[in-house]
Amino acid sequence: MTILTIEALRTEAAIFSAAESIHPEPLLYGVTDGKAVGTYIEQKFRLYLKEHYEFVQGNSASGIDFPGLLVDVKVTSIRQPQSSCPFKSARQKIFGLGYSLLIFVYDKIDNSTNRTATLNILHTIYVSAERTADFQMTRGIRNILANEGNKDDLIAFMSDRNLPVDEIEAGNVADEILRNPPMQGFLTISNALQWRLQYGRVIERAGQEDGILTVYRNNP
């Protein structure tokens, strides 16, 4: 059986999105829980791939759906395009999550006549790992560096932005930024016990920025 690659994952995601958008599903009729819809799509997509490809499946230890490819699948409604992900380190907000995202953005339509639901996949977007940092955080840091900012400026900025780090860690992160300036991120990441990821900007910018790819778009 063929080994799954990132290119194949994106190709199959486009095919899956088109098929799912015209599939009437009785199990989802009347379901309003976004998590249930997300689980449905993730499991169905994984089973679809297993028919054709070999790949390492994610588990609670790896924390992502395709650990062999360093890709996690996210499913979100167009009405509120966001989801959560595990908080590992405050550095993720600056340097990225450490893995890429494959995001399915759907609009759920219930049909009361035949009591089915259709998940109209409006956008499927691939965000490469280096673009998964927070937009405003990375833009501010890159502006500081462009204007001859130093370690003190970076620490003050992180404090102003309420990055969840103590003074020592802020100094370590500032040193790392000076050694390895971050790329511009495109997610909006809110501080919480889990990161809250918001996808409005990647939906807007898909296909216009390096590392943010339009895998599928449903043209009405």
From Swiss-Prot:
GO terms for biological process: DNA restriction-modification system. This is Type II restriction enzyme NspV. It comes from Nostoc sp. (strain ATCC 29411 / PCC 7524). Its EC number is 3.1.21.4. The lineage of its organism: Bacteria, Bacillati, Cyanobacteriota, Cyanophyceae, Nostocales. The gene is nspVR. One of its GO terms (molecular function) is type II site-specific deoxyribonuclease activity. The keyword Kinase does not apply. It catalyses: Endonucleolytic cleavage of DNA to give specific double-stranded fragments with terminal 5'-phosphates. A P subtype restriction enzyme that recognizes the double-stranded sequence 5'-TTCGAA-3' and cleaves after T-2. Keywords: Endonuclease, Hydrolase, Nuclease, Restriction system. It is an enzyme of class 3 (hydrolase).
